[in-house]
UniProtKB/Swiss-Prot annotation:
Full protein name: UDP-N-acetylenolpyruvoylglucosamine reductase 1
Enzyme Commission number(s) from the entry: 1.3.1.98
Name of encoding gene: murB1
Keyword Cell cycle carried by entry: yes
MF terms in GO: FAD binding; UDP-N-acetylmuramate dehydrogenase activity
Coiled coil (residue ranges): none
Taxonomic source organism: Bacillus cereus (strain ATCC 10987 / NRS 248)
Length: 301
């Protein structure tokens, strides 16, 4: 591991941090250390990192802004690549937008709305990066990334870089081809938006933000929606009907505001959250005969 660290530093891939606690990189403020954390300065840094990872046959994981993650208390084995700096470029040409995978999604939706571009209003309250949003087909307010993405530039596990079209991304509810079938890193996304009326777009954005502020516990560390909606039901409704609102294990609590959110009340461990998730799954299955599946990504040892 020491030799890999030295080569990463010599290759100038970006910041190289050893045994770096990941709690500071997730919105839930939970997570043990990464053996090696890389914050790349540019695409070339990511490519070189993957070359060295392959050379040393080391496991690797990519995270964005940590908004949809639950990281194990034991941390993550191998190399963790955190996207953000160096992948935050933006190019707007009429209604076509090309943006780096590390660009903050809320910042992007706000900026484009002020320019009178419609299509990203749904993302006004979704934390995280563009790359993470494309990876999981993030959505809200009856829309999602699949409605606006035309193509994405992907760095695959074998080091090759290629564009995937909308069809090749194989989007479905909160999923894409990148999650299992063709794992890779979203370096850049191209969106096709619509030219609209600025005041109306900004108004919708503000309405969406207000709704989230009034109904979701963003004043506490959390990872967003924990469970996927088991269509035709809503996960939050089922959890609340089961009487689990406010239920707490350790420092993790099912939010009083919204049943599909688990908040860190202070000092919560990943195990606290996992125990709550298991409780919810079993309770909903027993009471309603409905299988619950997590939307939050659970990673680590």
């Amino acid at each position: 591991m020491e030799q890999l660290v030295n080569e990463l530093i010599e290759a100038n891939v970006g910041r190289v941090l050893v045994d770096e606690p990941l709690a500071r990189y997730t919105t839930m403020k939970i997570g043990g250390p990464a053996d090696i954390l890389i914050v790349p300065k540019h695409v070339a840094g990511i490519e070189k990192t993957l070359q060295l990872v392959k050379k040393y046959k080391t496991k690797w994981t990519v995270i964005g802004r940590g908004s949809n993650l639950l990281v194990s208390d034991l941390g993550i084995e191998g190399v963790v690549i955190r996207l953000g700096e160096g992948l935050d470029h933006l190019e707007v040409e009429k209604h076509r937008v090309r943006v780096g995978g590390g660009y903050p999604l809320i910042k992007l939706s706000t900026l484009l709305s002020r320019q009178g571009l419609a299509g990203l209003e749904f993302a006004s309250g979704i934390p995280g990066s563009v790359g993470g949003a494309v990876y999981m087909n993030a959505g809200a307010h009856k829309s999602d990334i699949s409605n606006i993405l035309s193509k994405a530039l992907i760095l695959f596990e074998d080091g090759t870089i290629d564009w995937l079209t909308h069809e090749e991304m194989e989007f479905s509810y909160r999923t894409s081809v990148l999650q299992t079938k063709r794992p890779g890193i979203v370096l850049e996304a191209e969106f096709q938006l619509q030219i609209g009326e600025r005041e109306g777009i900004v108004s919708v954005m503000q309405k969406n933000k207000d709704y989230r502020r009034e109904t979701q516990p963003w004043n506490h560390p959390c990872a967003g929606s924990v469970f996927r909606n088991p269509i035709p039901y809503f996960a939050g409704d089922l959890i609340e009907k089961a009487g689990l609102r406010g239920y707490q294990i350790g420092g993790a609590q099912i939010s009083e505001m919204h049943g599909n959110f688990i908040i860190n009340t202070g000092g919560a461990s990943a195990q606290d959250v996992l125990s709550l998730i298991a409780l919810v799954k079993q309770t909903i299955k027993d009471k309603f005969s409905v299988e619950m599946h997590t939307e939050v990504e659970i990673i680590g040892r």
